[in-house]
């Protein structure tokens, strides 16, 4: 085994019928970690059900079905390898909670792969005013996914087959709306593919010999290496807190920024509880330090389980410790809200691992969501498609940060009526100083 490949996360976006599952399934099938025996079993079942047409999509269908039945699937199934990278596919959209997952998601995507159905009629629907494609692209950009690869899929089904003029038409149209969203289309490779037949997915296709650019695999290899935020101060949102016999209290979560190591003194926001980290574990192995992206459990001394909750944030007590937000200002984009949102609206915010009702205290401005220019000061309300700056006040103690400083703690989904009705990016936070916070003996000793 050579040196471990760099890990990157990819989010696959596009209209429901664009062939996302087939394309993703194809990559995982050809380059992934799915056991041959599992594939044979799937193939046999697919054949029995006459599902041959879904040549690769069933790979994903099976994975999704198993996940929905609560069978935790080995995450390796959602991985595939390029020459340079080990790629993880983030929850393929189309899923009802996709938007929420993309925001609070356990991972920030390094690159978005936009799949477009090149056949006539369908392409127009996917990109029309209310098209999902546009919404997904806007969402990806707003949430800081700065790199994009665009696949013109189903080239085997254009009229005539593998039509260059069709491809050119799509490149022109998609470029213009990617530009409106905020991407630079000159930096976006447009790869003509067939996820079904396999053209230009991994090997070059003679059917598309008019195309001289990279295959999908090559385009993935050309993604810029992401910078990981290990040099920022520690911020680790808690997912759970366990009491483990013989060890004690073990909070669990994903390191978003910075590093955590044994011997460190940590402060938990929003309460300000401060204690020493005794040990750090990843997959039951003790580590000397854990880095951004690692899911860790860490043992803390003299702390009761009831003193910590999901949504609290562990931080370095000597370096920008996490504090309660008194209020914060965010740029909010309204997505699927049926009515009008005005001052006093109090939906639930999902931000990192916290899930707390927050009041829209003051809608300060309405802005053009593409240029950021102010359209109206102190508007009476915001409705679907609008964007604006809003001052928000949490109804319970919560930790948030600015998107610029700590991206995973600075983006949120607004949930109401069992769906995501808006997304936001935090621009500024006013913090409260903790009062009467408990500092354990272990922490005092370390001071």
Swiss-Prot record:
Residues 5-230 form the tr-type G domain. Pfam families: GTP-eEF1A_C, GTP_EFTU, GTP_EFTU_D2. The modification 5-glutamyl glycerylphosphorylethanolamine is found at residues 289, 362. GTP binds at residues 14-21, 91-95, 153-156. Its main location: cytoplasm. It is found in: Cytoplasm. It comes from the Eukaryota. The keyword Amino-acid biosynthesis does not apply. The modification N6,N6-dimethyllysine is found at residue 55. Residues 14-21 are annotated as: G1. Residues 153-156 are annotated as: G4. GO terms for molecular function: GTP binding; GTPase activity; translation elongation factor activity. Keywords: Cytoplasm, Elongation factor, GTP-binding, Methylation, Nucleotide-binding, Phosphoprotein, Protein biosynthesis. Residues 70-74 are annotated as: G2. The modification N6,N6,N6-trimethyllysine is found at residues 79, 187, 306, 396. PROSITE patterns: G_TR_1 (PS00301), G_TR_2 (PS51722). The modification N6-methyllysine is found at residue 261. Residues 194-196 are annotated as: G5. GO terms for cellular component: cytoplasm. InterPro entries: EFTu-like_2, G_TR_CS, GTP-eEF1A_C, P-loop_NTPase, T_Tr_GTP-bd_dom, TRAFAC_GTPase_members, Transl_B-barrel_sf, Transl_elong_EF1A/Init_IF2_C. Residues 91-94 are annotated as: G3. This protein promotes the GTP-dependent binding of aminoacyl-tRNA to the A-site of ribosomes during protein biosynthesis. Belongs to the TRAFAC class translation factor GTPase superfamily. Classic translation factor GTPase family. EF-Tu/EF-1A subfamily. HAMAP family: EF_Tu_A. PANTHER family: TRANSLATION FACTOR. This is Elongation factor 1-alpha. It comes from Hordeum vulgare (Barley).
């Amino acid at each position: 085994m050579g040196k471990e490949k760099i890990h990157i996360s990819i989010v696959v976006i596009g209209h429901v019928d664009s062939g996302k599952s087939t394309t993703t399934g194809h990559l995982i099938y050809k380059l992934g970690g799915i056991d041959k025996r599992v594939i044979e079993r799937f193939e046999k079942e697919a054949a029995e059900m006459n599902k041959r047409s879904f040549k690769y999509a069933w790979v994903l269908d099976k994975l999704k079905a198993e996940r929905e039945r609560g069978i935790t699937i080995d995450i390796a199934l959602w991985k595939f390898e390029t020459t340079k990278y080990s790629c993880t596919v983030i929850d393929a959209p189309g899923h009802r909670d996709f938007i929420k997952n993309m925001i609070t998601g356990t991972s920030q995507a390094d690159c978005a792969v936009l799949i477009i159905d090149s056949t006539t009629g369908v392409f127009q629907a996917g990109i029309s005013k209310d098209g999902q494609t546009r919404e997904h692209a806007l969402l990806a950009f707003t949430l800081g996914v700065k790199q994009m690869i665009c696949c013109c899929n189903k080239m085997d089904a254009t009229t005539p087959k593998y039509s260059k003029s069709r491809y050119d038409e799509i490149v022109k149209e998609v470029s213009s709306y990617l530009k409106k969203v905020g991407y630079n289309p000159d930096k976006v490779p447009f790869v003509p593919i067939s996820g079904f037949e396999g053209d230009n997915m991994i090997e070059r296709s003679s059917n598309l010999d008019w195309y001289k650019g990279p295959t999908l695999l090559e385009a993935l290899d050309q993604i810029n290496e992401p910078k990981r935020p290990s040099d920022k101060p520690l911020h680790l949102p808690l997912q759970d807190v366990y009491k483990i016999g013989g060890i004690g209290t073990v909070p669990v979560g994903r390191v978003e920024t910075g590093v955590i190591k044994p011997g460190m003194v940590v402060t938990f926001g929003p309460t300000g509880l401060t204690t020493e980290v005794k040990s750090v574990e990843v997959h039951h192995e003790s580590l000397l330090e854990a880095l951004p992206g690692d899911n860790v459990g860490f043992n803390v001394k003299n702390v009761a389980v009831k003193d910590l909750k999901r949504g609290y944030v562990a931080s370095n007590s000597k370096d920008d410790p996490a504090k309660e937000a008194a209020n914060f200002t965010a740029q909010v984009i309204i997505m699927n809200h049926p009515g009008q949102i005005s001052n006093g609206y109090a939906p639930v915010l999902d931000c990192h691992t916290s899930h707390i009702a927050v009041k829209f205290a003051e809608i300060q401005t309405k802005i053009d969501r593409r240029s950021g220019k102010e359209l109206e000061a102190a508007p009476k309300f915001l409705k679907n498609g609008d964007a604006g700056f809003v001052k928000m006040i949490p109804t319970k103690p919560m930790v948030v940060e600015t998107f610029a400083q700590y991206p995973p703690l600075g983006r949120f989904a607004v949930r109401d009526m069992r769906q995501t009705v808006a997304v936001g990016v935090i621009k500024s936070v006013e913090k409260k100083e903790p009062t009467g916070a408990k500092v354990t003996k272990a922490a005092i000793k370390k001071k």
